[in-house]
Amino acid sequence: MTQSPRETETLPVWDLSDLYAGADDPGLDRDMREAARLARQFEVKYKGTIAAAGLSAAHLRAALADYEDLLTLQYKPGAYAGLLYSTDTTDPARGALLQKTREFDSSTATHLVFFDLEIGRIPPQTYERIKDSPELAPYRHYLDHERRMAAHNLDEAEEKILVETANSRGRAFARLATEVNSRTRFHMEEEGGAVEKTQSEILVLLYDPDRDTRRRAAAAITEGLRRNTHVCTFVYNTLLHEKEVLDRLRSYRAPEDSRHLDNELSGEVVDAVSEVCAANYGTVAAYYHLKRRLLGLDELTHYDRYAPITGDETDIPFGQARDIVLGSFGEFSPRLVDICEPFFERRWIDAALADGKRGGAYCAGVTPDLHPYVFLNYTGSPRDVMTLAHELGHGIHDVLASGNHLLDYHPVLPMAETASTFAEMLVFDRLRGELESDGERLALLCGKIEDTFATVFRQIAMYRFEQQAHRARREEGELPSERLDELWQRNMQEMFGDALTLGDDHACWWLYIPHIVDVPFYVYAYAFGELLVLALYARYRSEGEAFVDRYFELLAAGGSRAPAELLAGLEIDVASRDFWQGGCDLIRQRVDEAAALAG
């Protein structure tokens, strides 16, 4: 039996010493004390002076600079605690440190609540007088955004209550869901009895070439998730209701409106993405009709979605994954290699599998003066190579955006998926160019098509599930798990049409999706980013070297401009349904290419 890479090589774990030497580092408490002192000082110095008719550009610029210095210090302890906690959510000491930093953040933030509120209340004539001054030019985007948010702000006393209670409301329930899922063990039936597996270990078996292995893995997932049904359904209902209350208090019309405002996108643009994607679900059905034929099956069910169409998937050691990714990046620009090599050399990546480690993958960019960290669960599959590229893409974006000040450092969510998805495309293109036989090219292409479906159509199906779940909670009251199962299953099944039947065992699989708990309505950002990158990548293939600098400029902008403004510079109109349809057409072309290769 062939061993997986994680059994034959040591996978990297983080070195977080660039943040703190350890959980007992005196610098942690020292930084929290200093940030708290600076917050109190900031409040004394600036409160009541921002929303004033006589406000000068110089005074506002000084306040913004002090605010950034304070936040740069404040964010560091929480970032360290969050990174540490995600590698072992079962460790009480790590959980306690995470909670300590969150409570510190809340107590510090109570002294800062006034600032954004006062920016929103600067008299219009005063803002008109100072907004175009050279001193404020670097902060103009941030100021304009905060003033747009002002319509949804509460009074300072009310905002303080929400800040103070955040850790005992939704944030606490979201942490509970994370811990429940991280602690869950899945019991897979094998010869000799059941074998216990973590979430990351069981999910990878859905890609196994043996259908019975996939079936048993799926059954184990369903059984494990159903054990959590009561707790996770209660948690989700609580979060749905909390959002309903907050939306009512803040005068948001629809559940998703606050996310659109944060993302600096209009509801009309997001609706266009969602509706165009849903109108192209037929592409998914067409592909799975093809896949059923390739697999030689009479019908497909949910555990056949990711079945490889040829033989065993090769286990790829992490060192080889590194070479594949860096080699692909280097063909685009040596600059990408220069940015990414330190992630490997200085242990900015945590890839090992471990009990208690949360599932999934992410990249954490904290502040412009700190390097990002990449988190993943590396099992050695080809898709894990793509995940490594994806998260390093985020890291590239963070590094290139570090020339911005903190308040414009992070790109909004839809733009944050640009570099990550583009990085995947670079790896895919290189791998495709190295293959010689039609069979190999077909297998790679089918894997990419399925990944694209998961990023575009599945995320839109999830977004629609979220929309319906939030509305159902507001109209029907607390939702039983069966109702949530029904909404999940309906939206997921629509994507496949009559080409694949998900089956009742799949109905509870919403229970392990972290984004719907942690960041409501995040998921449409994936579809936005993937379809955007399909267009950008087509332009790169057409323009070659001329495109590279324009691409770097796009990433270097960070969050300094809204998506529509950033992309207008590349002659892209995000309000155009034709643009999004163009991306869906490119996906359909891949399906047609797969059909041609299959004969």
Where are these regions (language model features)?
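A well-structured
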Residues: M1-G311, R322, L597-G599
